[in-house]
Amino acid sequence: MKEVDVVGAGLAGAEAAWQLAKRGIKVRLFEMRPKKFTPAHQTPLFAELVCSNSLGGINLDNAAGLLKEELRFLDSLVIKVADRNRIPAGNALAVDRNLFAEEVTLRLSHHPLIEVIREEVVDINPERVTVIASGPLTSKALAENLKKYLESDYLYFFDAVAPIVAGESLDMEKLFFAGRYQQDKDYLNAPMNEEEYLRFYEALITAERHPLKPFEKDIYYEGCLPIEVIASRGKDTLRFGPLKPKGIIDPRTGKEPYAVVQLRRENLAGDYYNLVGFQTNLTWKEQNRVFRLIPGLENAEFIRFGVMHKNTFINSPALLTPYLNLKKYPRLFFAGQITGGEGYVAAIATGAWAGIAASGMFGKMPEPLPETTMLGGLIRYLNTAPVENFQPMGVNFGLVKPLDRKIKNKKERYKLLAERSLKDLKRWLAVNG
């Protein structure tokens, strides 16, 4: 019987299940929530976005934008649902996280070839075709069981989540809507003068943090650093990072502020706002104190405080084939952030590829993806990165095979890389679709 187990119904597992089912393969989709939650999840919904509600850029000269377009070519359910539940966020694809997760859950739960099993998986059968998409917060029992197939210890880094505040608790007299360089006015901005910035900075770097366990090193993913860690690198680091004012004009002064905090809508109604770039490991008491120093947030009601959690991933270059299955146990596939592909869209993409590849176990395996595509480049990285110091990687144009000729203008170069990628993916689909 053509049947595959998918462990975990996050972004990667949801997409893998969809890709398998659309190819006529029965899926048993395991999800331990709501019986057991991870430190970051809050709902039993599939594809819950535990960090930001943004899936990154939409333009094709943006790496995440190109990868999303490739996924549309692959008929990605998760991207299709994201497009349908989009909320204004300038050049980014941000979604109403609840409507998004609810629709993914509904679509998969009602698919005739997908059986949803709400149980924690603690034991893997290497004889069954299985996609392991248990995420960077894989349960302790499953992680221990997987060790016998991985023959190595897990790697890890710390990831952090930004707080969310209630829109009605904000002082809109001190805030304004604007985008950078007078683009779409989709972000709410809290401008700071120098005095306000320095007061906030001093409070931030001296605030109490949740302690790490004695045996844990403070290894962070550079793409999602806690804001207090960024601040500790220098007084002006924030002003060139998440609080940079470049391109934002305060309508009350007609000038760029000294620094600016941006807030992004969490839903279409604007009931909730995410503090952009404010991933944090501060204690909740300190978040209340420090973040209320931001102009307009003096009486902010925190719907969710920022938290930090340990993310686990495997040494993919040592363990996986280009199809994301184990070299020694070829029926076991891996997908999502546990592979070391960092970020939402990389998780969806590796889920899509693992699902497509796993379907090949019942017939003919697909040809490897072209390395000229963003997805093909990401898979190549997961296969060929240095084994000794393997680190998670977010999508970027450095993953894609270079053009035959040099193009100095970066925007033009990325545009040509994107055009080539989609053309080559169309050719691949004509043979492997």
From Swiss-Prot:
Chain sites annotated for binding FAD: 8-13
GO molecular function, one term: tRNA (uracil(54)-C5)-methyltransferase activity, 5,10-methylenetetrahydrofolate-dependent
Cofactor: FAD
The keyword tRNA processing is assigned to this record: yes
Pfam families (UniProt xref): GIDA (PF01134)
Gene Ontology CC annotation, any one: cytosol
Localization terms from the record: Cytoplasm
Keywords assigned: Cytoplasm, FAD, Flavoprotein, Methyltransferase, NAD, NADP, Transferase, tRNA processing
Reactions catalysed, as given in the entry: uridine(54) in tRNA + (6R)-5,10-methylene-5,6,7,8-tetrahydrofolate + NADH + H(+) = 5-methyluridine(54) in tRNA + (6S)-5,6,7,8-tetrahydrofolate + NAD(+); uridine(54) in tRNA + (6R)-5,10-methylene-5,6,7,8-tetrahydrofolate + NADPH + H(+) = 5-methyluridine(54) in tRNA + (6S)-5,6,7,8-tetrahydrofolate + NADP(+)
EC number(s) stated in the UniProt entry for this protein: 2.1.1.74
Major subcellular location class: cytoplasm
Record-level GO BP terms: tRNA methylation; tRNA wobble uridine modification
Function: Catalyzes the folate-dependent formation of 5-methyl-uridine at position 54 (M-5-U54) in all tRNAs.
Family stated for the protein in its record: Belongs to the MnmG family. TrmFO subfamily.
Protein name as it appears in the record: Methylenetetrahydrofolate--tRNA-(uracil-5-)-methyltransferase TrmFO
Organism: Carboxydothermus hydrogenoformans (strain ATCC BAA-161 / DSM 6008 / Z-2901)
